[in-house]
């Protein structure tokens, strides 16, 4: 591996943070448009999640992968409960704002210091947690955010069809 002055890593981190933030901005726009009642509605499909639950799950997966696994913060997580979560748009938007800010700090810390808590367990990811790299963790979080943004967009579409 060629030696660098660190600018490539800084550019990579900036690109990752920008991509994650674009997902968060799209999610918050959708949540803001839905309001308190609609954000908690589930589409009429077996196993479907509400918009609130989808975004809440994204907050929690980011906190776990970056904060707990990556930085060793031991943040509590109830993964099964994430999909039953309900609440107001204001509280959800506040939590998203906090995790967006934390993501910057946690990502930079994890990339610089390495993964802090490989023994943490609260994921269903099919990855070898003993060998994943900090870069893999960042890309995994972005992948999950993008995937769940698509799920959120489809959820809103299905709710619209169900009410027409």
PLM segments and residue spans:
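Short, contiguous alpha-helical
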Residues: 1-4, 13-28, 33-82, 122-164
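Generic cytosolic/nucleocytoplasmic N-terminal low-complexity/intrinsically disordered segments
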Residues: 2, 7-8, 108
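Acidic/histidine-rich alpha-helical segments that form the ligand environment
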Residues: 84-122, 133-146
């Amino acid at each position: 591996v060629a030696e660098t002055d660190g600018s490539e890593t800084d550019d990579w981190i900036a690109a990752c943070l920008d991509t994650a933030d674009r997902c968060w901005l799209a999610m918050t726009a959708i949540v803001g448009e839905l309001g308190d009642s609609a954000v908690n509605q589930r589409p009429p499909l077996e196993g479907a999640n509400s918009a609130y639950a989808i975004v809440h799950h994204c907050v929690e997966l980011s906190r776990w992968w970056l904060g707990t696994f990556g930085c060793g913060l031991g943040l509590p997580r109830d993964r099964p409960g994430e999909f039953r979560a309900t609440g107001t748009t204001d509280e959800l938007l506040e939590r998203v704002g906090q995790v967006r800010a934390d993501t910057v700090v946690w990502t930079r810390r994890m990339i610089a210091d390495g993964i802090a808590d490989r023994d943490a367990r609260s994921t269903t990811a099919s990855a070898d947690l003993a060998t994943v790299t900090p870069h893999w963790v960042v890309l995994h979080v972005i992948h999950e955010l993008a995937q769940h943004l698509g799920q959120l967009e489809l959820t809103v579409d299905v709710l619209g069809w169900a009410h027409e």
